[in-house]
Each structure stands twice: as C-alpha cells, then as structure tokens.
C-alpha cells in the first residue's frame, strides 16, 4: 500500500534533477559553472575530441560530466545526504583535491608521470561517487559516471595526454593552468 505523504522539498529536488537532465548544454552549464571551471571543461572537450576523433563522443562525455557534477551539487545543497554519505562526500572531496594536485604535479615535474597511479586515483574517485549517489540517482546516472571515468582513467589516453612530445602538450598545459587556478581559488 502506497503512502500518500506529500513532500514538496523532495518533489522540488526531483524536479530540479529532471529539468537539469533535460537542459544541460554547454550554454546552460556555463551560466551555472564559474569561468575557470568552464575553461577546464572546454579544454577537456577539445583534448577528448582530438583524442577520440569523434565530436559526438566528446560532447557526450563532457555533457555527462557536467550533469553528474550539477546533480551532485543539487543533492548536496539540498541536504539530501545522510551521515554516511556526508562522510563519503568528504572523502571524495579530498580525493578530487589529491587528483587535481597530482595532475598538475605530473605535468610540472619531469619524469614523474605514472599513468597507472593516475588511473587508480580516477577510479577511486569513481567508486566513491557511485557510493555517494547510490540511493539518489538512477542507473542511467551511474552509467554517465562510468562513461566519464572510463574515458579519463584510460591508461592509453593518459599516456597520450602526458606525452611531452605528443600532440596534446598544449592542451595539458592549459588544463593544468586551469586546475592550478581552481586549486588557488579553493574550488577543488
């Protein structure tokens, strides 16, 4: 027997997630994301498009990344997480911060790049994220998480991105400049 309990807050969050799922496009996302983050996302799109040689796939990966970040923010800002999820969220934030510092460090310090280490860090973030959103988002959202992390944690992609003589050197420089700004601004 279904209960007839009306919860406007829950309904509002559900509507936000539904609307967000329908409206996320580059132009909408840039109004909800700061300039530095937008620059990093744009650079991630460019390097992904070049690497995959597939504009549509690159757009899908970045759109999925934006949707996940914004849905996570909606859940967080609307206090939807229980104590365990809040603890996981704190671990996730620390892991993302570590990831950001590692991405920059591997670029700045010659001969330190370790694709397996970076891939593992990314996959650790993926697992934490799945645990955080487990009871809140659909299987489709979990698929989006996997789509994003499957691409960015791919060791071949990482090796190509960090190749000091490869075609992505300028992209990596711009990405690291943006991530460094995000670290300086306390946004990551």
Curated annotation (Swiss-Prot):
Annotated localization: Cytoplasm
Keyword Coiled coil: yes
Domain of life assignment: Eukaryota
Any single Gene Ontology cellular-component annotation: cytoplasm
Gene Ontology process terms (BP): apoptotic process; positive regulation of apoptotic process
The keyword Cytoplasm appears for this protein: yes
Primary location: cytoplasm
Keywords of the record: Apoptosis, Coiled coil, Cytoplasm
GO molecular function, one term: cysteine-type endopeptidase inhibitor activity involved in apoptotic process
Coiled coil region boundaries: 39-72
Signal peptide (from-to): none
Function description: Acts as a negative mediator of apoptosis.
Similarity section: Belongs to the TNFAIP8 family.
Protein name in UniProt: Tumor necrosis factor alpha-induced protein 8
Lineage: Eukaryota, Metazoa, Chordata, Craniata, Vertebrata
Gene: TNFAIP8
